Amino acid sequence: MFKINALNNLFVQFFDSINKFVYNIVPDKNYSYGLAIIILTIIIKTLLVPFSIKQIKSSVLMNALQPELKKLQTKLKSDPQKLQQETMKLYKEKNVNPFGGCLLLIIQYPILIALYYVFYSLHIKGIGFLWIHDLSQKATFSNWTTWILPIVSGATTYLSGILTMPPSSDPAQRKQTTTMNIGMSIFLLWMSWNFSAALVLYWTVSNLFQMAQSKIIITAVTAKLEAEKNSVEDSSNIISQNIDNKKNKKNKKK
């Protein structure tokens, strides 16, 4: 309990410092709080970049391994124990951690809980941002403008999920990923409807940041893997060519 309270208090103090800094530049609470939330989100997401790289790299590598995994599943479908051993052996050979993407999710939940406490503790009742009339309030059916942020939150959750998980060559894997993304988006839409606008704003900005970040990381990781693949192919071609040259020399001597 002490550790949780300490984390919550740390986030409150950190956000308060950011808000004071923003307020000195933009002395209007209807802008400073919203801008402070956006800046806080960018800082948190920047600190989590190493974990995001690990998650996305793991996804790209797992996707690249799908053809080989399929072959193993077909070859050893009658021997589950052997299949598991060979699968783990393949992961080890390719330096792939199948659970490499889980750490980011585990880290994000305590942060989300701490921010819930932050926005609950702050006196932001009546303070708005852009079209948001009150950052402390949840969405209501009576005011359609409060629907916008939860809907955007759900939509960006779905798009972020698509970009974070590179397209798979396996139709079953694609279907599973799509179903998971839709389910997560609906869940986050429901959560966004029941949380304060301040927390939903954090999650939405976090998704937008993640989308841009994922695009950059996937492009870089894919290019690196392609370069490594081409390098291996070039090395194989050189070796084959050297072998052929040696054979030709022997034949000429004969």
From Swiss-Prot:
GO terms for cellular component: plasma membrane. PANTHER family: CYTOCHROME C OXIDASE ASSEMBLY PROTEIN COX18, MITOCHONDRIAL, OXA1. One of its GO terms (molecular function) is membrane insertase activity. Belongs to the OXA1/ALB3/YidC family. Type 1 subfamily. It comes from the Bacteria. Keywords: Cell membrane, Chaperone, Membrane, Protein transport, Transmembrane, Transmembrane helix, Transport. The keyword Transferase does not apply. Interacts with the Sec translocase complex via SecD. Specifically interacts with transmembrane segments of nascent integral membrane proteins during membrane integration. Its main location: membrane. Pfam families: 60KD_IMP (PF02096). Required for the insertion and/or proper folding and/or complex formation of integral membrane proteins into the membrane. Involved in integration of membrane proteins that insert both dependently and independently of the Sec translocase complex, as well as at least some lipoproteins. Aids folding of multispanning membrane proteins. Residues 233-243 have a biased composition (Polar residues). GO terms for biological process: protein insertion into membrane; protein transport. It is a multi-pass membrane protein. Residues 233-254 are annotated as: Disordered. The chain crosses the membrane at residues 33-53, 99-119, 147-167, 182-202. It is found in: Cell membrane. This is Membrane protein insertase YidC. The keyword S-adenosyl-L-methionine does not apply.
